[in-house]
Amino acid sequence: MKVILIKDTKDGKANTIIDVSPGYATNFLFKNKLAEPLNSRTEKLLVKRKQQIEIEKQEKQEQIAKLKIEIEKLVLWFKLKGNKESVHGAITAKKIKKELEIKGIFVDKQAIQTSGISTFGTSFVDIKLSSQTIAKLKINITKDE
């Protein structure tokens, strides 16, 4: 019996057509609302769902690309105390996230890939926006008088 999976299961991912035994389909998949039987109506719905998912995926990629451009144009300025050789403190992912939020850019703290910047001058921090997209944020650290 052919069914369309509604949710991810051990048999496959959501929105895929699989072939299972009638008993398994009736007693487990349909009962737990994990699948629906394949017919002309559900097949049309599947095509529409896949198109909608593809559109949403493209829109998300466009948003990520715009966000990457916006982040790479940005320069964050921080002041740290210290003398010529040593710096007291560090710029952490938490501080970077806070500054980005002030500028209107919201990213997850775990996306900011830094272990803390503790040197004066210019540094670059990677911000992982997706599995394939990484933006480089420019950070300038000056001496606080």
Curated annotation (Swiss-Prot):
GO terms for biological process: translation. Signal peptide: none annotated. Pfam families: Ribosomal_L9_C (PF03948), Ribosomal_L9_N (PF01281). Keywords: Ribonucleoprotein, Ribosomal protein, RNA-binding, rRNA-binding. It comes from the Bacteria. InterPro entries: Ribosomal_bL9 (IPR000244), Ribosomal_bL9/RNase_H1_N (IPR009027), Ribosomal_bL9_bac/chp (IPR020594), Ribosomal_bL9_C (IPR020069), Ribosomal_bL9_C_sf (IPR036791), Ribosomal_bL9_N (IPR020070), Ribosomal_bL9_N_sf (IPR036935). PROSITE patterns: RIBOSOMAL_L9. GO terms for cellular component: ribonucleoprotein complex; ribosome. GO terms for molecular function: rRNA binding; structural constituent of ribosome. Binds to the 23S rRNA. HAMAP family: Ribosomal_bL9. PANTHER family: 50S RIBOSOMAL PROTEIN L9 (PTHR21368). Belongs to the bacterial ribosomal protein bL9 family. This is Large ribosomal subunit protein bL9. The gene is rplI.
